[in-house]
């Protein structure tokens, strides 16, 4: 009897394994052969090769070379539209953002992306979290670690097939990300619980998220880390790129020092009004962003229903759509577009009809460094003041240049291009012309 039961169990197990193997084979064939939704009449590039299972090679090509791929046409499965469509998309509710999910002797100092983040985190943290948290070295380390590990992990997971995602919790990088999340929670939760218990409202992001949640359950630690991620990464990348551009153009630094000194002397200190009168500094930031934006395509949306644009272009439901930012290098809009010209937008301000579009924070269809439309970066005004204040201190207090024969490094990930943390500067202290 026991032998019979054992034989039956073994035979049944073999049948089950055969059944599972057959289903797995069918699923793999389906995943390989299933059609990818394509908009009729539009060219498609970067198709998966015949034996590129799960499109891993295709994903790597996109992650490493998306900007070049856009020059060839439209990338699939994301639909990249011409900037001509930006005005139609910017406020159309059918395109959903929510669904898209430095003395003569120089001393070597690294102008590291993540070291700059370490300087900007307390600044933004003071506004977002208040004095209780922003100066806590543990919070700074948790935020920096979450950013660094989070970016690497996100890029890694984009290459993996989605059916492997349940296994991600065991990936070493994912474990490191969770470690930083746990540390952030250890710091934030006592502050949040105390604030809620005392009913003390405050004008910071803790209260903002509670108000926006309107009683719905949410994870405040995730929310604060996401906000910090969005603000510190973009600010640090902006800082790194503009410092490198200035190091390559020392004559611009001389003119900027003069502008900063004159503005501070006029107003007595580094005020918001003084910053608003630094047109060359504003132009320098906008030009650096034009030449090296963080993203080469923006306005990422997902269509909630079928959409037919004004020229008859039909876009199916649930299509991931972006708008290319290539106008920022259009020679008809920006003469000699490959050249860094810090004075470009100062000169454009003299043209009356372009004057309002020349501010660093202006989001236009011809310069989408901050996006465009109702979802353009809401924190760009705060970030602009933050970066300008830091640059004023840097320009007045330090001299800097690039090491000889140092090539710039970048981190490429699809449409995103960040300055690499390996970039270094030669810097020394100088005596500033006016006290800040």
Curated annotation (Swiss-Prot):
Positions annotated to bind heme: 377
EC annotation from Swiss-Prot or TrEMBL: 1.-.-.-
An annotated Gene Ontology molecular function: monooxygenase activity
Xref: PROSITE patterns: CYTOCHROME_P450 (PS00086)
Pathway(s) annotated for this protein in UniProt: Alkaloid biosynthesis
Domain of life: Eukaryota
Keyword flag Magnesium: no
GO biological process, one term: mycotoxin biosynthetic process
UniProt entry keywords in alphabetical sequence: Heme, Iron, Metal-binding, Monooxygenase, Oxidoreductase
Gene3D superfamilies attached to this UniProt entry: Cytochrome P450 (1.10.630.10)
Pfam family of the protein (one): p450
Cofactor(s) annotated in UniProt: heme
TM spans (from-to): none
Function: Cytochrome P450 monooxygenase; part of the gene cluster that mediates the biosynthesis of paraherquamide, a fungal indole alkaloid that belongs to a family of natural products containing a characteristic bicyclo[2.2.2]diazaoctane core. The first steps in the biosynthesis of paraherquamide is the production of the beta-methyl-proline precursor from L-isoleucine. They require oxidation of a terminally hydroxylated L-isoleucine to the corresponding aldehyde by enzymes which have still to be identified.
Family of the protein in this entry: Belongs to the cytochrome P450 family.
Protein name from the UniProt record: Cytochrome P450 monooxygenase phqO
Organism this protein belongs to: Penicillium fellutanum
């Amino acid at each position: 009897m026991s032998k019979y039961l054992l034989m039956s169990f073994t035979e049944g197990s073999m049948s089950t394994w055969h059944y599972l193997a057959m289903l797995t084979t069918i699923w793999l064939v389906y995943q390989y052969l299933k059609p990818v939704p394509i908009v009729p009449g539009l060219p498609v590039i970067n198709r998966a090769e015949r034996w590129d299972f799960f499109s891993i090679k295709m994903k790597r090509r996109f992650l490493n070379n998306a900007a070049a791929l856009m020059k060839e046409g439209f990338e699939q499965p994301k639909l990249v539209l011409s900037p001509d469509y930006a005005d139609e998309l910017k406020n159309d509710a059918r395109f959903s953002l929510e669904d898209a999910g430095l003395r003569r002797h120089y001393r070597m100092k690294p102008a590291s992306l993540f070291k700059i983040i370490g300087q900007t985190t307390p600044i933004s943290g003071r506004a977002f979290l208040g004095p209780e948290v922003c100066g806590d070295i543990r919070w700074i380390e948790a935020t920096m670690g979450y950013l660094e590990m989070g970016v690497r992990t996100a890029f890694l997971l984009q290459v993996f097939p989605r059916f492997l995602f349940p296994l991600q919790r065991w990936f070493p990088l994912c474990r490191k990300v969770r470690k930083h999340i746990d540390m952030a929670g250890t710091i934030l939760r006592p502050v949040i619980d105390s604030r809620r218990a005392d009913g003390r409202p405050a004008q910071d992001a803790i209260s903002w998220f509670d108000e926006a949640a309107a009683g719905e359950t949410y994870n405040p630690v995730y929310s604060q880390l996401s906000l910090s991620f969005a603000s510190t990464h973009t600010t640090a990348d902006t800082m790194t790129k503009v410092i490198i551009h200035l190091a390559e153009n020392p004559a611009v630094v001389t003119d900027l020092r003069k502008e900063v000194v004159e503005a501070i002397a006029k107003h007595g200190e580094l005020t918001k009004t003084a910053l608003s009168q630094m047109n060359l500094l504003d132009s320098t930031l906008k030009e650096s962003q034009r030449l090296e934006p963080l993203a080469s395509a923006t306005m990422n949306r997902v269509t909630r229903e079928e959409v037919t644009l004004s020229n008859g272009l039909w876009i199916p439901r649930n299509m991931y759509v972006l708008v290319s930012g290539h106008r920022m290098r259009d020679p008809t809009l920006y003469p000699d577009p490959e050249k860094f010209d810090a004075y470009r937008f100062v000169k454009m301000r003299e043209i009356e009809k372009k004057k309002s579009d020349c501010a660093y924070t202006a989001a236009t269809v011809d310069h989408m460094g901050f996006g465009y439309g109702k979802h353009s970066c809401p924190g760009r005004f705060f970030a602009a003041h933050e970066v300008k204040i830091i640059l004023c201190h840097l320009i007045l207090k330090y001299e800097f240049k690039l090491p000889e024969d140092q090539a710039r490094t970048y981190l490429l990930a699809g449409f995103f291009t960040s300055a690499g943390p390996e970039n270094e500067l030669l810097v020394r202290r100088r005596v500033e012309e006016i006290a800040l």
